Amino acid sequence: MDSNWSAEKFLTGEFENNLGSHCKLIAKDGKITGEYFTKPSRGKLIQPGFPVNGIYTPVKDGALLTMIVTYKIEGVKENGLERYSQATWNGKVYSSKKDFKMNWLLLNNEDENNEWAATNLGQDHFTKKN
């Protein structure tokens, strides 16, 4: 482990994932804030960047990490309400690497008849850009 490495320093910066999405993060005192710019989408997103909130916990060889983003999809209404989806990522950053993998859950706002289709899951590979 690099003796100069810190979770706060590493997690503050810009990252890109394997799908071409990127995020700008600020890590301080165990909390993460920033903006997430998603590339893949099933609809036109209401804004280019979405707020990121999360937490991290420093551990001996890196940090445990959780992030959440809520997406608003433009022009799609359900029962008069705007369409939203929400994603969470969980993973571990190793102090010996500049990249990391995070498992994600994407929850779409579906009515109870389509509840089975509401949740998708997968894994993203993030690389620090700066």
For each of these PLM feature ranges, what is it?
Residues 1-2, 51, 56, 97-130:
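Edge beta-strand at a domain terminus
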Residues 2-96, 120:
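Central antiparallel beta-sheet cores of small beta-barrel/beta-sandwich binding domains
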